[in-house]
């Protein structure tokens, strides 16, 4: 562990002591194996149940040994000591740092099984459907060996199938699907309609991706309601505007500003006197802003693709199509109009929850990732989670070459192609990590012009993902991919069957090339980690240009001088240090955004807990009827002839409708407040303090408003043996609902809504 001495000092002594204790327990576990091997399956399973009875483990060493012996019997996989150590740290609630290819799937299953034997219900959270289904089926024999049940959740399952799956002791599911089920369950009016049954523990695969990169991505449940969609005329007029003449874009390409000339052109072609008129500020101006953002800032094959006449967003952190994501506030419709497609229906947000708040619902959370160390501060700050570093089973043999830095993007791109061609000429397999679909396809085209066969993995063909990755380590393979995080399939040298393993080892193993630095070193390391698996040789190399986004953004306002050679290469440690500085600046910016966003979101998360508790009481007791009868005794007396169960359910339907409606209105109000909160600084008010003041004030009256509204409805609505006829009062719940994730909005400033930009489209 000497290589991580700096890490333990930075983190404090507790993690170091835990690591030493874990290593000692794993060493002791080996002493139990011979005795346990002699037991039959029934006796072995019973021994584990005895050790974990009462919700705690009496002998950790023997317990780990039992899990290991069972793994070998059921899966043919004997865990390495490092894997057993990781299992122990997960059971004790840490995030474990395990390198790619070190066997996280088995570790997660062993930990889930151990926690299940302790009587805990476990959700094993993955980043996509494929991994959830694969891992549940792969690990099923181990889990069922101990008499525990296991199931998986996927997007295409209906409510009945989900309800049955959630009854299992261990449930594998994508984080978004689990979150959507939480939201749907917040609309039920009968307990038996709930699909989830609660869980005690979340084991999170790719923990840094879920807990850091996507922590503040809102999951949304929406119902039918028209939204802010740009009219066709506005889309056509905006399409005619010229950059730098009619509008300008800031250096980060996150904001677009109309010039006076552009505003005048819009007013003339739309036949209006001023975009500032009251009649246009909340309608035409919003639609112009949406259309302009869609036209100028969202680029096809970078931010989205078009497939089967639909706009599909690209998840930047995973490099694949995000089937369930869409942009908010009419921006989705604006992009569809820009592409000449049918414009999708708008909707009212009924409820929303961030991934960070979702994970906060679990009494215990732990996780695994190959890049936990780099996320230590965020995990500690936002989740109070500790990181345990698990040493590799074999020493790392990968060679990480120093960055090759070029003066211009064009010079860098030529050098990348030359390097790939050189490596390919030897037969060494090459994996190239790009940042978006457009870049991956342009690079593949350039390589094919050199008669180099290329496999491309990006958002357009992610259905072929597992096969492409599995063969990426074969002789002569060149694979060009977007973001590799969460791909879930190991790259084995010599191909999926490792038939040419020895020859690829002689060639130097897998060569990984990054076409640019990412916004954080952690993402760079996710790509690097694809080479050098399980002690294999490998190479990693990043190409950088002074035109790259991370350099331009992180070095904003700074100047640097360098002397490139004839090819544009800048061989200078000083410049490499400066590029590293630029990356650290962008990392700091991301952390600041996360901190600010969490400060705004946390109060709403706390208020959600109060709403949830109120909802639970209304669902599970006769409280709704009792409160309505107390406030309107005469009306209650009129209904005495009805069955008590009918009266109580009618009360629930009425009370829950108005509680849900008022909560939805509160979310909409606070979103509007947040979008304009930056204006408070002009009035010398602290924006965050003012936001909290408004949130507390508005929420204080929410419960009473919901009760008052419910009492009013109770007095007027028809209630008979069929229940409360809310539809007749115009109080029907939406006839259709759908779920989606709000994309990490490239356009948002202090808030989540594109509408916040309407004050900034004029300089």
UniProtKB/Swiss-Prot annotation:
Reactions catalysed, as given in the entry: ATP + H2O + cellular proteinSide 1 = ADP + phosphate + cellular proteinSide 2
TM stretches of this protein: none
Binding site for ATP: 83, 101-105, 490
Principal localisation: membrane
GO molecular function, one term: protein-exporting ATPase activity
GO biological process: intracellular protein transmembrane transport; protein import; protein targeting; protein transport by the Sec complex
Membrane topology: Peripheral membrane protein
Record EC number: 7.4.2.8
Keyword Transmembrane attributed: no
GO cellular component, one term: cytosol
Top EC class, one word: translocase
One Pfam family, short name: SecA_SW
Keywords, sorted A to Z: ATP-binding, Cell membrane, Cytoplasm, Membrane, Nucleotide-binding, Protein transport, Translocase, Translocation, Transport
Record's subcellular location: Cell membrane; Cytoplasm
Described function: Part of the Sec protein translocase complex. Interacts with the SecYEG preprotein conducting channel. Has a central role in coupling the hydrolysis of ATP to the transfer of proteins into and across the cell membrane, serving as an ATP-driven molecular motor driving the stepwise translocation of polypeptide chains across the membrane.
PANTHER family per UniProt: CHLOROPLAST PROTEIN-TRANSPORTING ATPASE (PTHR30612:SF0), SECA INNER MEMBRANE COMPONENT OF SEC PROTEIN SECRETION SYSTEM (PTHR30612)
Assembly and interaction partners: Monomer and homodimer. Part of the essential Sec protein translocation apparatus which comprises SecA, SecYEG and auxiliary proteins SecDF. Other proteins may also be involved.
Family recorded in the similarity comment: Belongs to the SecA family.
Name under which the protein is recorded: Protein translocase subunit SecA 2
């Amino acid at each position: 562990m000497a290589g991580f001495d700096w890490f333990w000092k930075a983190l404090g002594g507790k993690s170091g002591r835990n690591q030493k204790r874990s290593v000692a327990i794993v060493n002791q576990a080996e002493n139990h194996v011979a005795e346990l091997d002699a037991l039959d399956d029934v006796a072995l399973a019973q021994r584990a149940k005895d050790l974990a009875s009462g919700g705690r483990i009496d002998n950790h060493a023997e317990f780990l040994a039992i899990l290991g012996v069972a793994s070998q019997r059921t899966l043919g996989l004997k865990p390495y000591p490092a894997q057993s150590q990781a299992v122990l740290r997960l059971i004790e609630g840490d995030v474990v740092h395990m390198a790619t290819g070190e066997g996280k799937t088995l570790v997660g299953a062993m930990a889930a099984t151990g926690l299940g034997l302790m009587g805990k219900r476990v959700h094993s959270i993955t980043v996509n459907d494929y991994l959830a289904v694969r891992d549940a089926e792969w690990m099923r024999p181990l889990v069922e060996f101990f008499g525990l049940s296991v199931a998986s959740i996927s997007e295409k399952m209906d409510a009945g199938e989900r309800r049955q799956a959630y009854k299992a002791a261990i449930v594998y599911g994508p984080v978004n699907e689990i979150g959507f089920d939480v939201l749907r369950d917040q609309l039920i009016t009968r307990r038996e309609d709930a699909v989830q049954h609660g869980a005690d523990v979340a084991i999170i695969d790719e923990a840094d991706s879920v807990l850091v990169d996507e922590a503040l991505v809102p999951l949304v449940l929406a119902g039918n309601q028209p939204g802010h969609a740009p009219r066709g005329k506005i889309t056509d007029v905006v399409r005619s505007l010229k950059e730098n003449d009619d509008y300008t874009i800031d250096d980060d390409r996150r904001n677009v500003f109309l010039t006076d000339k552009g505003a005048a052109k819009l007013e003339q072609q739309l036949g209006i006197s001023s975009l500032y008129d009251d009649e246009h500020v909340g309608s035409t101006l919003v639609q112009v802003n949406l259309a302009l953002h869609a036209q100028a800032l969202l680029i096809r094959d970078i931010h989205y693709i078009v497939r089967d006449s639909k706009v599909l967003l690209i998840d930047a952190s995973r490099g694949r199509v995000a089937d369930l994501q869409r942009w908010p506030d009419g921006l989705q419709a604006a992009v569809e109009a820009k592409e000449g497609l049918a414009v999708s229906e708008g909707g009212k947000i009924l409820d929303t929850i961030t991934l960070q708040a979702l994970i906060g619902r679990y009494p215990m959370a732990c996780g695994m990732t190959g890049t936990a160390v780099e996320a230590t501060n965020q995990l500690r700050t936002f989740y109070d989670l500790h990181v345990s570093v698990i040493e590799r089973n074999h020493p790392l043999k990968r060679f990480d070459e120093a960055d090759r830095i070029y003066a211009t993007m064009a010079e860098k791109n030529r050098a990348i192609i030359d390097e790939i061609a050189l490596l390919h000429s030897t037969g060494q397999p090459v994996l190239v990590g790009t940042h978006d679909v457009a870049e991956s396809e342009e690079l593949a085209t350039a390589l094919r012009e050199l008669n180099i066969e290329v496999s491309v993995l990006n958002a357009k063909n992610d259905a072929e993902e597992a096969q492409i990755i599995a063969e990426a380590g074969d002789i002569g393979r060149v694979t060009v991919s977007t973001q590799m995080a969460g791909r879930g399939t190991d790259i084995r040298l010599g191909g999926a069957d490792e038939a040419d393993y020895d020859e690829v080892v002689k060639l130097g193993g897998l060569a990984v090339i990054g076409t640019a630095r990412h916004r954080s070193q952690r993402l760079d390391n996710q790509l690097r980690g694809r080479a050098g698996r399980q002690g294999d040789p490998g190479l990693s190399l990043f190409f950088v240009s002074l035109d790259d986004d991370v350099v331009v953004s992180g070095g904003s306002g700074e100047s640097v001088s360098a002397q490139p050679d004839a090819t544009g290469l800048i061989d200078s440690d000083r410049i490499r240090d400066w590029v590293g500085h630029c990356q650290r600046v962008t990392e700091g910016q991301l952390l600041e955004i996360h901190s600010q966003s969490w400060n705004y979101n946390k109060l709403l998360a706390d208020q959600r807990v109060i709403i949830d508790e109120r909802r639970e009481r209304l669902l599970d007791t006769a409280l709704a009827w009792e409160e309505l009868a107390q406030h309107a005794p005469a009306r209650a007396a009129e209904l005495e002839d009805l069955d008590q169960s009918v009266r109580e359910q009618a009360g629930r339907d009425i009370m829950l409708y108005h509680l849900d409606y008022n909560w939805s209105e509160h979310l909409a109000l606070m979103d509007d407040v947040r979008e304009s909160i930056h204006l408070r600084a002009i009035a010398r008010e602290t924006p965050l303090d003012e936001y909290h003041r408004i949130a507390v004030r508005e929420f204080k009256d929410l419960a009473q408003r919901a009760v008052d509204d419910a009492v009013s409805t109770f007095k007027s609505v028809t209630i008979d043996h069929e229940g409360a006829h809310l539809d007749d009062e115009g109080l029907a719940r939406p006839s259709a609902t759908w779920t989606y994730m709000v994309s990490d909005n490239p356009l948002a400033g202090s808030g989540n809504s594109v509408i916040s930009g309407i004050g900034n489209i004029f300089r």
